Amino acid sequence: MSKIEEAKKKASETAVEDWLQLSVAFDGADEVDESLTLIKGGGGCLLQEKIVASSAANFIVLVDERKCSKKLGTQWTKGLPIEVVPMAVKPVQIRIKEVLGGDPLLRPAGTKMGPQLTDNGNFLLDWHFDPQANYDWRKVEDTLLHMPGVVETGLFIGMTRKVYVGNLDGSTRVLGE
């Protein structure tokens, strides 16, 4: 076993209790709206990122100004990431279209054949929704999470109280408290 494989094995065996009480966690986001609701998961690691964010007393987000929007879906146009167990992809796609509309597309792997796998071995759907519609994101998330086969969504609602924004001119600003 290589050193990298050993490190990965050790990290995967680390008990959540060992790091469950983080005082602060920092991360980026794919998009943040005016109410500090985030879309994350563009890189495919949304479940584990949500576990870390929810385990931190303070979850602080860092973005550049191009990721800020009045409404979700206007800057990040690649869809809302949804982690789904492989056998449920088709039923979940059909259900999303029936209940929420839009177009939930299976995310392809970038450098190999087939769909992209999450770190947990699941597939990702990218739900392309109407960015002009007025969504209650808590209801959307609840609807998605109650679909059999959906593991997690890329919606991070009420998880951060502060977003640090780097502006293109080099200045910074803080959204939130």
Language model regions located:
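Conserved phosphate- and dinucleotide-binding cores of soluble alpha/beta proteins
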Residues: S2-K10, L22-E177
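Glycine-rich helix-loop-beta junction characteristic of Rossmann-like nucleotide cofactor-binding loops
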Residues: A15-L20
